[in-house]
Amino acid sequence: MLILTRRVGETLMVGDDVTVTVLGVKGNQVRIGVNAPKEVAVHREEIYQRIQKEKDQEPNH
């Protein structure tokens, strides 16, 4: 795992098309903004896991 330190307002790049910007820090919460092409799915981990679980429960699997 790559670990980076960023301050509020600073951005990191993921590949050529995805940017992640630190928007704010309040206590133990960090607000981030993600800019990505429409074809790149961006989800919180718990939402992604729910989507995968629902896919696994479909009759075609």
From Swiss-Prot:
Induction field: Low levels of expression in early log phase, increases about 3-fold by stationary phase (at protein level).
NCBIfam families in the cross-refs: csrA (TIGR00202), PRK01712.1 (NF002469)
Encoding gene per record: csrA
Protein name per UniProt: Translational regulator CsrA
Family: Belongs to the CsrA/RsmA family.
One Gene Ontology MF term: mRNA 5'-UTR binding
Compartments it resides in: Cytoplasm
Entry keywords, A to Z: Activator, Cytoplasm, Repressor, RNA-binding, Translation regulation
